[in-house]
Amino acid sequence: MTEQVKPERKGALVTGSSRGIGRAIALSLAKAGMNVCVNCSSERSLPAAQELAAQISATYGVKSLALVANVASAEEAQTLVESAHTAFGRLDVLVNNAGITRDGLVARMKEEDFDAVIDVNLKGTFNCCKAATKIMMKQRSGRIVNMSSVVGVAGNAGQANYAASKAGVIGITKSLSRELAPRNVTVNAVAPGFIETDMTDALSDKQREAISSRIACGRLGQPEDVANLVKFLASDEAGYITGQVICIDGGMAL
């Protein structure tokens, strides 16, 4: 009887994954049996990233490592992607989750606040996609999931920089999906609404009630809600889905 060859374990990189939505995504992909590279942007966040990587390895029996890289830097993004690829021997999934906000009305917004958001959210996505594309094209397989936002779809007062960055992510997603589809690489965007994270912890009870009243499901989303969607888009079952922007907002209307 011929011995069955065990399939090689897939490798995934999730940027901005030391906390919040990114953390939930990293855990979800590890639970699905993937080796996962956890990323944070600074040494200050490294202990949390290392703790998550250790938890992933201990709980799910997969390889995991934590790496510091500012994805706004093309050089650091390239090194990050290459390091994940080297560690796992392959790179099947890239989740561009790293993102920041610097909210303010346009009339009062500082140029550096506009640039900072664009650099991380939009340029960072481009940098990581560019680095991963070469690997995935050579493999003739891969999944790229970019984190957009409902704000990138509909806009929002006081978030012109954030909205522009997330709308740009949609543009990159649709363009890159056309470039990579012939090589069996899918590229999709996820557009979350209000999700329970550190960013929403600062909301007052009154603000929470106002937001919840605009959501058909009557509640803010959980990081795991987003992670479950990303896990599906990263799976073999999602091979015929590409170039899509999927809103996960509980039926919210901005």
Question: What residue spans do the PLM features occupy?
Answer:
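Conserved glycine-rich cofactor-binding loop
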Residues: 11, 18-20
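Short, small/polar-rich loop/turn modules that mediate ligand/substrate recognition or access, typified
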Residues: 90, 181, 186, 222, ...
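Substrate-binding pocket helix/loop in short-chain dehydrogenase/reductase
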Residues: 105-106, 110-118, 200, 211
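Active-site helix of classical SDR
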Residues: 129, 165, 173
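Alpha-helical segment proximal to the catalytic Tyr-Lys
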Residues: 134, 178-182, 239
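C-terminal substrate-recognition "lid" of short-chain dehydrogenase/reductases
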Residues: 137, 141, 219-248, 253
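Residue(s) in the substrate-gating loop at a strand-loop-helix junction
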Residues: 149
